[in-house]
Amino acid sequence: MRGSVVVLAVMWGTTTVSAQGRGADEAAIRAHTAAVENALNKRDAAAVVALFTADGDEIDTDGPRRSGRDTMRSAGAADLAAWSPTMRFSLSVTGIRFLTADIAIVETAARFTEGPVRANRGTSVLVRQDGNWLIAALRVYPAQRAP
């Protein structure tokens, strides 16, 4: 029981400390998300993967796991080349949860102006490396069905 109290005290203390000053981190994460949106709309796979950690990975709906920047860059370039040149992509943050001062889970919603998929949602793990927030893992799911 004593160990549980210590663990809870440490967790509560960490949560209290990390809750302070999150505004700047949330703004940086939202700016990172805007950079992803911008790179995708430019069809710039290199710029997209630069927003991931070197060993980052992604799984898009029912597709394979893509790990590492080189793999994601080549596969992403092929995916982006298949997009209609007039299609626009928007990405919005729907939730941010900080696990530590340098790790956050970010929920997003995406919209597409044309094509067979008009919306999806994603969950990513962002880590702060050298002062920059980067995606360590991204999972993309179909959009939530209307109730």
Predicted regions and their residues:
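Bacterial N-terminal signal peptides
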Residues: 4-15
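Short, low-complexity N-terminal intrinsically disordered segments enriched in polar/charged residues
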Residues: 13-54, 70, 145-147
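General beta-strand recognition
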Residues: 47, 57, 104-105, 134
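A short gly/proline-enriched turn/hairpin at secondary-structure junctions
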Residues: 57-67, 80-85
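Surface-exposed, charged secondary-structure patches
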Residues: 71-119
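Short beta-strand edge/turn micro-motifs at domain boundaries
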Residues: 119-146
